[in-house]
From Swiss-Prot:
GO terms for cellular component: cell division site; cytoplasm. The lineage of its organism: Bacteria, Pseudomonadati, Pseudomonadota, Betaproteobacteria, Burkholderiales. Cell division factor that enhances FtsZ-ring assembly. Directly interacts with FtsZ and promotes bundling of FtsZ protofilaments, with a reduction in FtsZ GTPase activity. It is found in: Cytoplasm. This is Cell division protein ZapD. HAMAP family: ZapD. The gene is zapD. Belongs to the ZapD family. InterPro entries: ZapD, ZapD_C, ZapD_sf. One of its GO terms (biological process) is FtsZ-dependent cytokinesis.
Length: 251
């Protein structure tokens, strides 16, 4: 099944973007070629841009504290797997402590480093990091891969608590949902939400159908419409019945 996820609010939308950026960063950092490490570094700059929002850290701390207070009363409950509960609570408490230790504006260390700041300013220009534009950066790219990797990992280190916090919030949100099998009649599906507030919607479709879900929602109703794309033309609405799995997640 192919999984599509749709955020219902700006906070979850930001966390999904961060998750995608951190996954891209980890993939390219693990490679050997300097061009791949260039992608890792520019992704680091993107992460700094997203995490530089003043209220992101406080939002994550408030959400983790809320989850801690929700889960802590289940300690000693015989109906709850205690080892799993303690693992989650320990992870939340450690991440909260790491967030509390973060000093200043997120990503400020990249701004304060003049060399990295010069690379960052050139990286937004198409072709702006050529060797004649940034000879010192080109020289750094000739260093051994492991040394480059250590440098980039060092520059990422101050932002890792935000990565961990985002991962916990998204995991708890995803685990809160119950999947149901539904059918989009003639490619369209709608469902009343009865005033319930959801954070995230997941749509899973069989890959052999080659359909693409488009979703929208408000506090009363959600809609899922399926399209299909042939080649490089704009996707068109389908008029066939489409079976899919729908999961609504609410922290």
């Amino acid at each position: 099944m192919i999984l599509y996820e749709y955020p219902f609010n700006e906070r979850i939308r930001t966390l999904l973007r961060l998750e995608d950026l951190f996954e891209r960063f980890a993939f390219f950092l693990a490679q050997e070629d300097p061009r791949e490490h260039h992608v890792a570094l520019t992704t680091l700059f993107e992460i700094a841009e997203v995490t530089g929002r003043a209220d992101l850290k406080s939002d994550l701390m408030k959400e983790l504290e809320r989850q801690r207070q929700t889960l802590a009363p289940f300690r000693g409950n015989p109906g709850i797997e205690q080892n799993a509960l303690e693992a989650v609570l320990g992870e939340i408490e450690q991440t909260l402590a790491n967030l509390a230790q973060m000093q200043g504006k997120t990503g400020q260390h990249l701004v304060d480093n003049e060399w990295l700041a010069s690379i960052r300013s050139r990286a937004v220009i198409p072709g702006g990091t050529c060797k004649f534009d940034l000879p010192s950066y080109y020289a750094w790219q000739q260093w051994p891969a492991e040394q480059r990797r250590q440098d980039i990992a060092k520059w990422m280190l101050p932002m890792l608590p935000l990565r961990d916090a985002a991962a916990i919030v998204l995991r708890l949100a995803r685990e809160s949902g119950q999947a149901s099998k539904v059918m989009a009649m003639q490619g369209s599906y709608q469902q009343m939400l009865s005033g319930r507030s959801y954070q995230l919607m997941q749509v899973r479709v069989p890959p052999e159908l080659r359909v693409i879900p488009e979703a929208s929602a408000n506090k009363y109703m959600l809609w899922v419409r399926f399209t299909m794309q042939d080649g490089d033309v704009r996707p068109r609405a389908v008029d066939i019945d489409v079976p899919f799995h729908l999961t609504l997640c609410n922290l």
